[in-house]
Amino acid sequence: MNVLSCSINTLKGLYDISGVEVGQHFYWQIGGFQVHAQVLITSWVVIAILLGSATLAVRNPQTIPTDGQNFFEYVLEFIRDVSKTQIGEEYGSWVPFIGTMFLFIFVSNWSGALLPWKIIQLPHGELAAPTNDINTTVALALLTSVAYFYAGLTKKGLGYFGKYIQPTPILLPINILEDFTKPLSLSFRLFGNILADELVVVVLVSLVPSIVPIPVMFLGLFTSGIQALIFATLAAAYIGESMEGHH
C-alpha cells in the first residue's frame, strides 16, 4: 500500500510540475480549457520547419542522393545507429519514435538560439523555444515513459512486471519508484539546460551587447544539440532496458 501511495504521489507531482510557470504566459481559452498559447505557437513553427524541410528534401528522390536528401539520409542513419546501439536487433520499429524525439528537441533547442522570438509581441509574456517550457519537457518525458512501458508489455506481456522483484523482492519499492522518477530526470535535465542557456545569453546581451554573446551563442548551439542527443539516447536505452528486462 505504501508503494502504491508513493507511486500515486509521484504521478501527482508530475502533474503539478506541468503547471509550474516561469515568468508571464499568454493563454487561449478554447471551450472550457485554458491553453498555453506560447508553447503551441512555437511548437507549430518547429513542426512546420521539420515538415517543410523533409518535404523539400525528398519530394524528388534520386538514386544518388544530393544536397537535402543526402543530409536527411545521414540523419536517418545516425538515428538508426543510436537506436540499434541502445535497443538491439529489434530497434527497427522504434526508429520513427526516437527520430521524432531527437529532431523535435534538436530543432526546438536551436530555434531558441537562432530565431528572433523576442521581436514578436504578445499581450502577455514572450515567445521562446518550446523546450524552454517545463510543460513541453514533461510531456516529452511522459511520452517516453509510455513508450518503454508499451515496449516491455508488448515483448513480455504481464511477465514484464516480474522485473520489479529482480534480483530480490526486497527491491520492489525501489524498482517501482525508479520507473516513475525517470520522467522527472528527463524533463528537468532538458528544461534546466535550455532555460539556463537562454538566461545566460539574455544577461550577457544586456551587459555587453556586441562581443561576448557571440561565442556564448555558439556554445549554446553545441549544448542544445548534445541535450537532444542525450534525451534520444536515454529514451532508446529505457526502451531497450524494458525489452531486455535488466538494469
Swiss-Prot record:
Q: Which SUPFAM superfamilies match?
A: F1F0 ATP synthase subunit A (SSF81336)
Superkingdom per UniProt: Eukaryota
User: Where's it mainly located?
Assistant: plastid
Asked whether the keyword Transmembrane is assigned, the reply is: yes
**Is the keyword Thylakoid in the record?**
yes
The UniProt entry, under InterPro entries, shows: ATP_syn_F0_a_bact/chloroplast (IPR045082), ATP_synth_F0_asu (IPR000568), ATP_synth_F0_asu_AS (IPR023011), F0_ATP_A_sf (IPR035908)
Q: Which GO terms describe its molecular function?
A: proton-transporting ATP synthase activity, rotational mechanism
Keyword annotations for this protein? Answer: ATP synthesis, CF(0), Chloroplast, Hydrogen ion transport, Ion transport, Membrane, Plastid, Thylakoid, Transmembrane, Transmembrane helix, Transport
Give the function comment from the record: Key component of the proton channel; it plays a direct role in the translocation of protons across the membrane.
Which family does the record assign? Belongs to the ATPase A chain family.
Record-given protein name: ATP synthase subunit a, chloroplastic
Q: Which organism is it from?
A: Vitis vinifera
Q: Give the classification, highest ranks.
A: Eukaryota, Viridiplantae, Streptophyta, Embryophyta, Tracheophyta
What would be the name of the gene that encodes this protein? Answer: atpI
